[in-house]
């Protein structure tokens, strides 16, 4: 029987290439996604066996439906990979509590609840890998709600790593910068941008090599280090 992994956020290009990387290790996939047709197309384009994929077309906001599916799983899971997220618009979220709440649900509350609910079904020696963001390393006005949600997620993963250590479950924190997905529309130096395929390969390798925290792009690690050295009384005057 093949080991099974769950990928949440299966419609993304990162997930497409994660399918390719983990498929080589003979896994079966349980995929949660917003667009089932897109996931099916990913599988076809990569020429993968569709019988190794179970696809659930669910909204990020509908966590209760996710729980029902988890309750029906009658086998252990080897790994969980959380790729989903949404940046949002802080100017709109400051004026609309519902939008702000949705940002926190999508980027913090839902991944925490989903992972926590799955832990009893996770095999000892398994893994949890979560894509966070450099936006979670220091608060910025242009990423106000998204960044604070990702900061909470990074802290949760640190605590979870301690909590699951005795079970031999490996917790992997992924910290990307800019990734050239379909929605990417930021003008930036090419050195700051990573392709979805390279991102997926780095995630795969970090799980294989049990790297607990990885930056997808080394330049972002340097930038984050420098930003964290700036005193708050100076940092507050910046606009980025």
Language-model-detected regions and their locations in the chain:
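Catalytic Tyr-X3-Lys loop
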Residues: 86, 96-113, 153
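Residue(s) in the substrate-gating loop at a strand-loop-helix junction
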Residues: 133
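Conserved mid-core segment of classical short-chain dehydrogenase/reductases
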Residues: 63, 71, 85-101, 142
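Rossmann-fold scaffold of SDR-type NAD(P)-dependent oxidoreductases
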Residues: 8, 77-85, 130, 172
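C-terminal helical subdomain
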Residues: 173, 188-225
């Amino acid at each position: 029987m093949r080991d099974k992994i769950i990928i949440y956020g299966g419609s993304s290009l990162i997930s497409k290439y994660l399918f390719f990387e983990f498929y080589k290790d003979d896994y079966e996939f349980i995929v949660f996604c917003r667009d089932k047709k897109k996931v099916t197309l990913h599988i076809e384009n990569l020429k993968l066996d569709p019988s190794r994929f179970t696809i659930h077309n669910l909204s990020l906001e509908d966590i209760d439906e996710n729980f029902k599916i988890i309750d029906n799983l009658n086998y252990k899971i080897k790994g969980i990979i959380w790729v989903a997220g949404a940046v949002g618009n802080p100017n709109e979220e400051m004026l609309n509590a519902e939008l702000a709440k949705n940002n926190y649900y999508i980027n913090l509350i839902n991944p925490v609840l989903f992972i926590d609910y799955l832990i009893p079904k996770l095999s000892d020696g398994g893994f949890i890998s979560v894509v966070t963001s450099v936006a979670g390393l220091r608060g910025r006005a242009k990423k106000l709600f998204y960044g604070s949600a990702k900061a909470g997620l990074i802290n949760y993963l640190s605590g979870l790593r301690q909590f699951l250590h005795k079970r031999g479950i490996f917790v992997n924190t992924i910290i990307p910068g800019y990734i050239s997905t379909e929605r990417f529309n930021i003008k930036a130096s090419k050195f700051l941008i990573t392709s979805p395929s390279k991102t997926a390969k780095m995630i795969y390798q970090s799980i294989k090599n049990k790297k607990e925290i990885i930056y997808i792009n080394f330049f972002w690690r340097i930038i984050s280090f420098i930003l964290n050295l700036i005193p708050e009384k100076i940092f507050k005057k910046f606009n980025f």
